Amino acid sequence: MLTRKIKLWDINAHITCRLCSGYLIDATTVTECLHTFCRSCLVKYLEENNTCPTCRIVIHQSHPLQYIGHDRTMQDIVYKLVPGLQEAEMRKQREFYHKLGMEVPGDIKGETCSAKQHLDSHRNGETKADDSSNKEAAEEKPEEDNDYHRSDEQVSICLECNSSKLRGLKRKWIRCSAQATVLHLKKFIAKKLNLSSFNELDILCNEEILGKDHTLKFVVVTRWRFKKAPLLLHYRPKMDLL
């Protein structure tokens, strides 16, 4: 079968962040226009702006952070195309935890990286559109994972209700994976309170509404840094934003 070779720099524009000009890390997409950036770059930009950095469309007049979402598919593509990128990012994270004297989470202790499998084909800035390693990976039977994210970095949370229209949780203290999202918490609260829909809830940190795709790790780093555990979050009935 014929294969087509593509120069890596020919697709750089599609896998780099317009704000930092580097390869996408923790890829995050604007839901209005589907332009993608590094999460940290986009969040920092939206602290003082409410438009997309690329097309300048207004994301939301007052709460643009609620209209961005983690793009796992794009991040997987970037890691597969750019040799060594995921290993380098994991190494930086480990160094960060070591510097602070904190235990390295289980999900970043190893350096398993699918991009490493493609290293030889990328040495000259080229990638094969039809890579046999993808076929081999697809043929492998996935191993059953019964860990339920227990080996992930864990976050302790206190869920408080700040509305008289909702009742408080019997057990407001929970501990879960740092990779869990605000959406997971909404579903958890809705189930415990027997609400008809989790979309009826807002979750806040420091009186700021959190986007449904924010991971707890992201919330801790950007909203609770240098504060003692547990992470304090409040929930209330959803309020329509003008």
From Swiss-Prot:
Record field: compositional bias (Basic and acidic residues): 117-140
GO biological process: random inactivation of X chromosome; regulation of transcription by RNA polymerase II
Region (Disordered): 115-149
Lineage top rank: taxon: Eukaryota
Gene3D superfamilies: Phosphatidylinositol 3-kinase Catalytic Subunit, Chain A, domain 1, Zinc/RING finger domain, C3HC4 (zinc finger)
Molecular function per GO: histone H2AK119 ubiquitin ligase activity; zinc ion binding
Presence of keyword Repressor: yes
SMART domains, sorted: RING
Zn finger spans (RING-type): 17-56
InterPro entries: PcG_RING_finger (IPR051507), RAWUL (IPR032443), Znf_RING (IPR001841), Znf_RING/FYVE/PHD (IPR013083), Znf_RING_CS (IPR017907)
Keyword Repeat appears in the UniProt entry: no
Record keywords: Metal-binding, Nucleus, Repressor, Transcription, Transcription regulation, Zinc, Zinc-finger
Cellular component aspect of the GO annotation: nucleoplasm; nucleus; PcG protein complex; PRC1 complex; X chromosome
Main subcellular localisation: nucleus
Cellular location(s): Nucleus; Nucleus, Nucleoplasm
Ranges where the record places region Interaction with BCORL1: 132-242
Role summary: Component of a Polycomb group (PcG) multiprotein PRC1-like complex, a complex class required to maintain the transcriptionally repressive state of many genes, including Hox genes, throughout development. PcG PRC1 complex acts via chromatin remodeling and modification of histones; it mediates monoubiquitination of histone H2A 'Lys-119', rendering chromatin heritably changed in its expressibility. Within the PRC1-like complex, regulates RNF2 ubiquitin ligase activity.
Subunit composition and interactions: Component of a PRC1-like complex that contains PCGF3, RNF2 and RYBP. Interacts with CBX6, CBX7 and CBX8. Interacts with BCORL1.
The protein's name in its UniProt record: Polycomb group RING finger protein 3
Organism the protein comes from: Homo sapiens (Human)
